[in-house]
C-alpha cells in the first residue's frame, strides 16, 4: 500500500488537536511525515472553515470524518454541511454511544435512526459509514448485532 492511500485519523492525536494553534502544528507534522490525507475526528470546537483552510494551506485532503451519534442522528444536515465545507464524501458513526447493545428494542431504534440519517446522506451524495467494534459481534436473540445492522 502506498502512503498516499493511507490517511491519519486525528483521533489518535486528539490531545494535540483541541485548539487552532495545536491543530495546525499537528497537521504540519502529519504533512512533513509524508501523509496527504486525514480523517477529522476528536478535534476541538474549531470552525470547519478554519480546518478546511488549514488543510488547503498544507495540501492535505480531508478524506472522511467521524461524528458523534447524536450529531449524525439529531443534526444530520449540520454534518452534511460540514462535509460539504470539507469537500468530503464520507462520515462514519464511531460508536453506538448510549445504546444498550443487549436490548433488541434499543438496537432496532438505533438502526432506524441511522437509516434515516443515511438516507439524508445518500440524497446529498454523501456516504454514512459505520465503524464497528467487538461489541457488534455479540449475539442478541441468536443474531449477530452487526449482521442485524447491515440487514436493516
Put a short name on every predicted segment.
Residues 1-89:
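N-terminal pre-domain/capping segments
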Residues 69-152:
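Active-site acidic/histidine proton-transfer and metal-coordination neighborhood
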